[in-house]
Structures are given as structure tokens and as C-alpha cells.
Amino acid sequence: MNSTFDKHIDANDVKKTLSKYILADGFDFVFDMEKSHGSWLVDQRTGKEYLDFFSMFGSMAVGYNHPYILAHAADFAKVGFNKTSISDIYNTYYAEFVDTFGRIGMPSYLPHAFFVDGGALAVENALKVAFDWKVRKNLEKGIGEKGSQIIHYKQAFHGRSGYTLSMTNTSDPRKYMYFPRF
């Protein structure tokens, strides 16, 4: 059986290869996954290091190749390769994470958590909860099913999913022209 990664692509050919299949208009930089460290990004083509003020849109807050992450790579691989539907199927890794998060990261006045796979989904779920709450309150007051508008920053990035894209400032109207506008 052939591996998905049988063909090696040289760092100098990354953008050309990606451009065959996707819109590859990102940075002129090839991320070196082995040599990048802490807050430093390394360009695989040149070896040049760059101080990272980007952190992959905030998803790499602990930096690159953090020693703790590397030391526990096997556990992270198990969790990543065997992703369960955490709302219905549980495992010890999930219980340990939730327990740690609950003890350290949750204030007593917010006793419950809801976990999703990213910022756009978090924003969308927050919007759904807010719409539901507001419409219910308006129905109780007898003013009907009102409550489907929100206030948001115009020049901000909110995500790349349905609701979030309709709030995200983008220069290409084809990306959102048939989405409801908030």
C-alpha cells in the first residue's frame, strides 16, 4: 500500500504545487515544521527566522515545537487520530482536559462549558444562542419573532463559516453575496 506522502515536494515548489489545486495567495514563505521554535518561524527555503506576531491566527499561542508538546506527542497523536464525537462518546483524555479546564480556566460564576472545534464555530454557536434567547424574550413580551440582528465590528475578522463570513469584512462580494447580512 502506498503512503499518501510517498511523493516529496521540495520547499521551493510548495507554492507552485498548491497553486495547481487551491488559491495560493498566502505569504511568500514555507513554514519549516521541524525548525520553527517558540515564537520563531523558520522559512524552510532560506533558513531565515522571523519573530512571529501572527501565531497562525492565534492557534499557536504556546509557540512552535514546545518541549511539553513534543514530550507528549504520542498522546496528542492518539487524540488527533481517534477524534471522538465529544458530545456523545467520551474518553479519559477528554475528561482530563475538561477537569483541568474547569479547575483552572472557569470562574465560579460560569459553571458550564461548551467546546467546539474553532473560533468560527464558537462565534456561530454564540450567535445561535443569542438569537434563540432574544426571540424567546420578545415572544414573551408579545412583540413577535424579532431579534435577528447583531452589532459587530466592520473591519474585523470573525471567521470563514456562514454566519461569521457574513460579518467579516472582505473585499470580494462573491464570498458573501447570497448570505444574510447582519
Model-derived segments and their meaning:
Residues 99-182:
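PLP-dependent aspartate aminotransferase-fold enzymes
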